[in-house]
């Protein structure tokens, strides 16, 4: 009987076990994104301390890699795609987790931004790619110049445009434009449909805007996709 009180005390003060979503997040994500999702995990400050991208602050609700319009929250599928693919050069793929564990990680990520609870994000329309040929590349080159893409990405897509040295992300960190010769490094995917999605949605929090309202004709965007693809080494 004398053991009952100490046992009750132990049960009272012992910390509750993390729920499954938090447990997966703490195991797989907190090292970079931090236990509280602020992008300040133990490894965060060894990752490009003075350059963007840094680990995402998940409490701000601003996500780069989405299929939703600029300024909108991502869908669950967007978050899962990022977990499955990773971000070349910055974030590993988490295909080593089970599908269920990745879904739990998404649940944990969404908890850091309360607006997810009532949000119903809808993806933009992504039409099927047309045939991309020399004619579309030529038109895309004209669009590339007319839209001012070279100011950041450079005349030949090397990421060395005149604006490149001054570019910063929303936190004030310097950010480099993509070198379009190396699609394997594209953060939002290297396939034609991925590039189209990036042009339509933009990369929120960076100088890369959405062109959805600039080019209302999907054909013009596909021309630009074709030209970007032609720059690959």
Predicted segment positions?
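Sec-dependent signal peptide recognition
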Residues: 1-7
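Electrostatic cytochrome c docking/interface patches
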Residues: 10-25, 116-145, 184
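Periplasmic/extracellular electron-transfer cofactor-ligation site
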Residues: 23-52, 115-119, 141-172, 201-210, ...
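Catalytic cores of nucleotide-enabled group-transfer and carboxylate-activating enzymes in metabolic
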Residues: 35, 105, 109, 128-134, ...
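Extracytoplasmic electron-transfer domains, predominantly the class I c-type cytochrome c fold
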Residues: 47-95, 102-110, 166-229
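Short, structured interface segments
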Residues: 104-122
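Short, charged low-complexity intrinsically disordered segments located at boundaries
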Residues: 110-114, 131-141, 210-211, 226-231
């Amino acid at each position: 009987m004398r053991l009952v009180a100490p046992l009750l005390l132990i049960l009272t003060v012992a910390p509750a076990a993390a729920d499954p979503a938090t447990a997966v997040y703490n195991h797989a994500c907190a090292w970079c994104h931090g236990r509280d999702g602020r992008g300040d995990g133990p490894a965060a400050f060894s990752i490009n301390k003075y350059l963007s991208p840094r680990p995402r602050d998940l409490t701000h609700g601003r996500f780069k890699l989405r299929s939703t319009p600029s300024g909108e929250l991502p869908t669950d599928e967007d978050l899962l795609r990022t977990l499955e693919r990773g971000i070349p050069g910055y974030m590993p793929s988490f295909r080593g987790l089970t599908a269920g564990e990745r879904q739990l990680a998404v649940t944990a990520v969404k908890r850091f931004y309360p607006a997810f609870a009532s949000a119903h994000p809808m993806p933009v329309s992504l039409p099927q790619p047309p045939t991309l040929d020399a004619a579309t590349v030529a038109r895309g080159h004209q669009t590339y110049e007319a839209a001012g893409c070279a100011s950041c990405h450079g005349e030949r897509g090397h990421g060395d445009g005149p604006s490149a040295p001054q570019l910063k992300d929303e936190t004030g960190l310097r950010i480099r434009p993509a070198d379009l010769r190396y699609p394997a490094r594209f953060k939002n995917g290297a396939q034609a449909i991925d590039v189209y999605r990036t042009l339509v949605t933009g990369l929120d929090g960076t100088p890369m805007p959405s062109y959805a309202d600039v080019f209302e004709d999907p054909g013009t965007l596909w021309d630009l996709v074709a030209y970007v693809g032609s720059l690959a080494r």
